[in-house]
């Protein structure tokens, strides 16, 4: 009934690299407004025609359920043994209002963004991971000036 045609190959192409990168960018503030999670950055990078530029920017995750936001804050930069805690956005906003989250790695897939990096407080970094779940778009609001 079924004919063996050999192995099936599927190639997953990720297309072109995005114009903007959050790598090494620092989050100044995180807000939740009208079901959108908004990250305000001091700058993000853009790459076009071999030229790197920086821009003041906000990243908006639309239709984000705040109950599904996971923020993991560790006690070190995860080189060996570590401990940490899972906190919610209000606690992050209270405890780390004077801190900056430096994005080192950004990963996106099917309504999920994972930002990993260092949370800087008074010049001292600890590892931090933010798991963001959203059903809308991820929008770059960039000041091109």
Could you describe each region identified by the protein language model?
Residues 2-145:
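Surface-exposed, interaction-prone regions used to assemble/regulate multi-protein complexes
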């Amino acid at each position: 009934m079924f004919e063996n045609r050999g192995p099936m190959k599927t190639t997953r192409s990720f297309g072109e690299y995005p114009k903007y990168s959050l790598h090494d960018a620092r989050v100044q503030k995180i807000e939740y407004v009208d079901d959108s999670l908004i990250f305000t950055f001091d700058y993000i990078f853009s790459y076009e025609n071999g030229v790197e530029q920086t821009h003041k920017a906000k990243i908006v995750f639309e239709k984000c359920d705040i109950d599904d936001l996971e923020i993991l804050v560790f006690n070190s930069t995860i080189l060996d043994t570590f401990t940490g805690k899972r906190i919610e956005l209000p606690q992050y906003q209270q405890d780390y209002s004077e801190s900056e989250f430096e994005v080192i790695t950004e990963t996106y897939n099917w309504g999920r963004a994972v930002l990993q990096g260092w949370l800087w407080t008074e010049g001292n970094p600890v590892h931090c991971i933010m798991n963001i779940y959203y059903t809308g778009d991820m929008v770059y609001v960039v000041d091109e000036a």
